[in-house]
Amino acid sequence: MALPIILDCDPGHDDAIALVLALASPELALKAVTSSAGNQTPDKTLRNVLRMLTLLNRTDIPVAGGARKPLMRDLIIADNVHGETGLDGPALPEPTFKPQACTAVELMVKVLRESDEPVTLVATGPQTNVALLLNSHPELHRKIARIVIMGGSMGLGNWTPAAEFNIFVDPEAAEIVFQSGLPIVMAGLDVTHRAQIMSADVERFRAIGNPVATTVAELLDFFMEYHKAEKWGFHGAPLHDPCTIAWLLKPELFTTVDRWVGVETQGKYTQGMTVVDYYSLTGNKPNTTLMVDIDRQGFVDLLAERLAQFSIR
């Protein structure tokens, strides 16, 4: 039986590819997509969800827009990474359907209440919507199987020296999620920086030849430009968000450890840092399954295999 999931995302090139991977995988049942503000403004990320689902011919999936700003802070966006639209690069279709007349949290609540089994939440942007859900509906925690997030790291940041972007945008929300007592699975920079897509991989995807694979290749053409800067030391582009979906599909591709994680919300230099108690120094019980390594080639092969599914539909 397919695993029911809700995807809360802020597309964003890698969010869009995570969405593609989820919908190419019969092991997963995508019950709803909610948008968060992060990689671009809330209106643009919501529109990008609708554009991608239009491309994928999945306008049957309910969509709702989420919080317009973090819980306690002004919104920061990553337009320097994802461009003016948030999905610069390919010529995506205009949306052919509209979002639900409700908020992201209201849609999540509806899905959770109607589900016969616990639902996995996958959050690939800032954690604002998920935190609002957890705080406002404690009675539904039992309907959440786990929360799989892309965010954080063990010490290295990509937005500040200490903080990864998604957590930095709304650290208060992330702290609520990590301390919720629910099972948390974290795909942080430690693993996503090892999930680099190389130029040869992009050409492999392009050669698949169907419109979805071509769009993914064109998304990556744009996404790779930002990551060519010498400061990163990358050979390709780290494909952060699809690691969450890949873990659900093939956890054997990943090395994980269970550790306690907290989020720094006030540090002068460390706001948004995920503090990972790797050596169990605090005595705190582990609250997070932390991805620390990946079979990169297996990850690329999975993406290529699933992109090819769109050729036979």
Curated annotation (Swiss-Prot):
CDD domains per the UniProt record, alphabetical: nuc_hydro_IU_UC_XIUA (cd02651)
Name of the featured protein: Pyrimidine-specific ribonucleoside hydrolase RihA
Family the UniProt entry places it in: Belongs to the IUNH family. RihA subfamily.
The species this protein was found in: Enterobacter sp. (strain 638)
Gene3D superfamilies the record matches: Ribonucleoside hydrolase-like
Gene: rihA
GO molecular function term, any single one: uridine nucleosidase activity
UniProt keywords, alphabetically: Glycosidase, Hydrolase
InterPro entries the record matches: I/U_nuclsd_hydro_CS (IPR015910), Inosine/uridine_hydrolase_dom (IPR001910), IUNH (IPR023186), Pyrim_hydro_RihA (IPR022975), Ribo_hydro-like (IPR036452)
Active site residues per record: H240
Enzyme class name: hydrolase
